[in-house]
């Protein structure tokens, strides 16, 4: 059910080096960013908007009936971009929960977007995110696959203790592939973007470590599959096959 207190923001920019113009690449007859927008709308959890500094992206989204907010071009991260967008879209501070959905997840399922709200039912949780169990050694050892190490709270829930590109944790038992979808309480997002980059964040190149180093609580919902991000031409062709393009 759509909540007026929830805002889904999709940060999108044209600066990808491996896939120039990535948000506007065609997948099954729609620009990639519009495919993501459609999935966020289908999740029916709140208002949905694209946050961008690119007029081309804004034009494509509005041409397909989506909402856009223009942001500055100099943001160091998607979190900073969505915070500016939140301030623009909600000056009266009625929004309580902000979802940060990457614009290169065209195959994400609407129910996975909604799943990120689950951990926020606990008022002690500042930030929610998702992960799926790793089933292959190739995935476990790939430094481009971010692993979340967490303390189990339930069969489908972890409390995050660390995120790493290394193969971890050691020993027998499941390992989890982190999915870059976040749900923030508004106050948590405000606090997060005000913090300077942290030592472990800079070392691992993972901005969520900034929150953990500051003592913020991140809980993780476990889902069955990892949505395929689009970072390479091969990823793009896979997404086109999945979506019938």
Swiss-Prot record:
Its EC number is 2.7.7.38. Keywords: Cytoplasm, Lipopolysaccharide biosynthesis, Nucleotidyltransferase, Transferase. Its main location: cytoplasm. The keyword Transmembrane does not apply. Gene3D superfamilies: Spore Coat Polysaccharide Biosynthesis Protein SpsA, Chain A (3.90.550.10). Belongs to the KdsB family. This is 3-deoxy-manno-octulosonate cytidylyltransferase. It comes from Rhodopseudomonas palustris (strain TIE-1). The gene is kdsB.
């Amino acid at each position: 059910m759509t909540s007026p207190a929830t805002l889904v923001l999709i940060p999108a920019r044209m600066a990808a080096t491996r896939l120039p113009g990535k948000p506007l690449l065609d997948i099954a007859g729609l620009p990639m960013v519009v495919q993501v927008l459609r999935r966020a709308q289908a999740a029916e959890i709140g208002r949905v908007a694209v946050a961008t500094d690119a007029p081309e992206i804004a034009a494509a989204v509005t041409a397909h009936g989506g909402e856009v907010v223009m942001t500055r071009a100099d943001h160091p991260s998607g979190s900073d971009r969505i915070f500016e967008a939140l301030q623009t879209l909600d000056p009266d501070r009625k929004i309580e929960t902000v979802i940060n959905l990457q614009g290169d997840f065209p195959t994400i399922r609407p129910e996975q977007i909604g799943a990120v709200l689950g951990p926020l039912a606990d008022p002690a949780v500042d930030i929610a995110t998702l992960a799926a169990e790793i089933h292959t050694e190739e995935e476990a050892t790939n430094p481009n696959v971010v692993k979340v190490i967490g303390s189990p709270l339930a069969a489908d829930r972890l409390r995050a203790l660390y995120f790493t590109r290394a193969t971890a944790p050691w020993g027998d038992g499941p390992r989890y592939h982190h999915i870059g979808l976040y749900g923030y309480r508004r106050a948590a997002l405000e606090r997060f973007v005000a913090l300077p980059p942290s030592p472990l964040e800079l070392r691992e190149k993972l901005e969520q470590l900034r929150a953990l180093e500051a003592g913020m609580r991140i809980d993780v919902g476990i889902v069955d599959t990892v949505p395929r991000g689009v970072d390479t031409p091969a990823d793009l062709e896979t997404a086109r096959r999945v979506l019938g393009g």
